């Protein structure tokens, strides 16, 4: 934790500290911060990713190429680790060929790859971002008994953490977006892992004042109520099937209700395809009951400004998730001042306090969702204080400016720590087999 580091003077704005970010994707969680450090702090920032090369807002994006990975012959339980090693080797080989890259601090996402090989190149401190520590029980794998994880999926959960454990042991410090995510980590490592959220860009995600209630070519009549649901993919882990049951009953009870569903017809997480006999969980759900698709509108994927406008029009936004990484869509909806009714699951409870900044219902409690939704839809103005409190929470505690300032302080403190043991010389000779 930051409090455990010595109180050293932070780097002055004139100092060109060099930070190397490592993530499979760009910009991912680090892009906003890298651009800010370049512009406001005068830092040099490099970003190692599978995308590129490019110079984006002063940040050099360096591409790396993975030369191998797990195959059908690789044991199912070790494929994640095998892929991670190949990614980590590609990071090492790419930077070994760039002697001009001499960072003062390395910041990497622990998951797609490990930064531990880079310790053989650099003697600077390392910070890792820890997003999710897998567990076989009391987790996303066994939360939905109607869609049970297979035996080997449960066994694999233990080995999927292998590279995370390496990074937890080797890094000088780390951070996780929420307390719930941090507390999934083994207790022995938690003291050196801060809780710092990724940050919501409130210049985009904010309540948009609009004349009338028009979205695109769709005009929402004054006496209509608008219910919204957003998910990157339509799947059981985000409760799409539960939401559709709730939406159907609400449509039956409210002739003036319109439902807007945002997302793509794909499965991003979990093993839904194995249980439904096909790739489309949406089609499987729609085949279970009769839905009025003239009132339940599937809008596809929306650009952030359009989605912010839609959320600003919403009378009620429903969000569900199993115990898993919290969706940014919940935070975006809060930032836009939508009244939230969400599943009473651990990651959600960290953000939503019932009666203060939203409402909660049991994940499987369709009756509970319908009852509370009815109350909001009948008297939406009576619940506007919840929406306003949620909006203030995001702006005061989870906005990009607030979160990036916390990250800057962490980076400066860790970057000021004494250097670790100097690295070995970059090995030469035969390359690894594979």
Question: What are these model-predicted stretches?
Answer:
Residues 9-60, 65, 418, 424, ...:
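N-terminal subdomain of nucleotide-sugar transferases
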Residues 68-77, 124-162, 203, 207-208, ...:
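Acceptor-binding helix/loop patch of EC 2.4 sugar-transfer enzymes
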Residues 216-238, 244-249, 259-260:
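Conserved donor-binding/catalytic core segment of Leloir-type glycosyltransferases
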Residues 267, 273-301, 305:
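Nucleotide-activated donor-binding/catalytic signature segment of Leloir-type glycosyltransferases, i.e.
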Residues 322:
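Aromatic "clamp/platform" in nucleotide-sugar-dependent glycosyltransferases that forms part
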Residues 339-342:
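Short hydrophobic beta-strand element within catalytic cores of glycosyltransferases
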Residues 354-355, 359-366, 375-380:
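Conserved acidic donor-binding segment of nucleotide-sugar-dependent glycosyltransferases
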Residues 368, 375, 382-397, 403-409:
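A short, well-ordered alpha-helix in the C-terminal region of glycosyltransferases
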């Amino acid at each position: 934790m930051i409090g455990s580091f010595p109180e050293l003077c932070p780097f002055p704005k004139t100092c060109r500290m060099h930070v190397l970010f490592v993530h499979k994707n760009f910009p991912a969680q680090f892009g906003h911060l890298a651009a800010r450090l370049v512009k406001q702090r005068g830092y040099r920032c490099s970003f190692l990713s599978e995308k590129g090369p490019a110079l984006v807002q002063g940040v050099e994006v360096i591409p790396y190429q993975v030369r191998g990975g797990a195959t059908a012959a690789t044991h199912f339980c070790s494929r994640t680790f095998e892929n991670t090693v190949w990614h980590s080797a590609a990071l090492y080989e790419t930077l070994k060929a760039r002697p001009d890259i001499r960072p003062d601090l390395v910041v990497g996402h622990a998951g797609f790859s490990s930064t531990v090989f880079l310790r053989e190149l650099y003697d600077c401190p390392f910070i890792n971002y820890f997003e999710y520590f897998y567990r076989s029980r009391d987790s996303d794998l066994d939360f939905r008994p109607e869609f049970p994880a297979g035996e080997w999926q449960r066994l694999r959960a233990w080995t999927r953490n292998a590279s995370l454990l390496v990074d937890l042991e080797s890094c000088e410090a780390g951070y996780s977006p929420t307390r719930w995510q941090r507390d999934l980590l083994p207790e022995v490592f938690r003291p050196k892992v801060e809780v710092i959220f990724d940050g919501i860009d409130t210049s985009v995600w904010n309540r948009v004042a609009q004349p009338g209630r028009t979205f695109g070519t769709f005009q929402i009549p004054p006496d209509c109520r608008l219910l919204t649901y957003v998910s990157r993919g339509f799947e059981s882990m985000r409760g799409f099937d539960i939401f559709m049951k709730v939406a159907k009953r609400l449509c039956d009870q409210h002739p003036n209700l319109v439902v807007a569903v945002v997302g793509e017809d794909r499965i991003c997480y979990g093993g839904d395809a194995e249980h439904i006999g096909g790739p489309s969980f949406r089609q499987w759900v729609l085949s279970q009951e009769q839905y009025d698709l003239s009132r339940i509108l599937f809008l596809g994927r929306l650009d952030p400004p359009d989605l912010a406008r839609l959320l600003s029009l919403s009378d009620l936004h429903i969000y569900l998730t199993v115990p898993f990484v919290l969706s940014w869509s919940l935070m975006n909806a809060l930032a836009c001042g939508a009244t939230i009714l969400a599943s009473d699951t651990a990651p959600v409870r960290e953000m939503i306090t019932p009666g203060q900044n939203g409402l909660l219902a049991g994940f499987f409690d369709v009756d509970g969702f319908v009852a509370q939704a009815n109350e909001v839809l009948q008297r939406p103005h009576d619940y506007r204080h919840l929406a306003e409190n949620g909006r203030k929470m995001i702006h005061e505690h989870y906005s990009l400016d607030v979160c990036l300032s916390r990250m800057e302080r962490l980076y400066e403190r860790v970057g000021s720590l004494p250097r670790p043991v100097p690295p070995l010389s970059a090995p030469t000779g035969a390359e690894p087999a594979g």
